[in-house]
Amino acid sequence: MLFDKYDVNSVEVHDPGMVKYINVKSALNLHTGGRFSSYYAGKINMNVVERLINKLMRTEKWTGKKYSAYKITKDAFDIIADKTKQNPLQILINAIENAGPREEVTRLKYGGIAVPKSVDVSPSRRVDEALRNIATGATNASFKSKKSIVNCLADEIMLAAKNDASSFAISKKEEIERVAQSAR
């Protein structure tokens, strides 16, 4: 059970490449305290909701305020459950699958000249990029706005789950993939 409300056993990841990297195991406390940071690829052992909470703490306003980010995420999940009548964890996983870019651009140097080259994105990076863009989209939408960050996070997750281009995460993914397409 997540937040003592949502069943984690009914959730499934549809993207076969991301199954290993999206952890939805039930946890009493979504605060590992960096327990997995010393392990290689230890973040795959962290619950994906805790990773979203950690991504929400990126800006100056939210630095170190994990309980505030926890409450924001919990309230956003309640809003998602009320609006969609579905498990909000499944909606979040669908949003992560849709918002993760499949290819991006890296820079190669040939004789002192930097040339962009299109490369495939690893599944771990896809999850990281998706979570970061969802959290960034929510904080950007709530900045200097009457909408609270709770509503903005819920909207961002629902729009990304629907693969809607008005979502910040989806628009960033499409921009990255468009640049990669031109660099082939």
Curated annotation (Swiss-Prot):
InterPro entries per the UniProt record, alphabetical: Ribosomal_uS7, Ribosomal_uS7_arc, Ribosomal_uS7_dom, Ribosomal_uS7_dom_sf, Ribosomal_uS7_euk/arc
Record Pfam families: Ribosomal_S7 (PF00177)
GO molecular function annotations of the record: rRNA binding; structural constituent of ribosome
Highest taxon of the lineage: Archaea
GO biological process, one term: translation
Keywords: Ribonucleoprotein, Ribosomal protein, RNA-binding, rRNA-binding
GO cellular component, one term: small ribosomal subunit
Recorded family membership: Belongs to the universal ribosomal protein uS7 family.
Function: One of the primary rRNA binding proteins, it binds directly to 16S rRNA where it nucleates assembly of the head domain of the 30S subunit. Is located at the subunit interface close to the decoding center.
NCBIfam families to which the protein is assigned, alphabetical: PRK04027.1, uS7_euk_arch
Summary of subunit composition and partner proteins: Part of the 30S ribosomal subunit.
Entry protein name: Small ribosomal subunit protein uS7
Lineage: Archaea, Methanobacteriati, Thermoplasmatota, Thermoplasmata, Thermoplasmatales
This protein's encoding gene: rps7
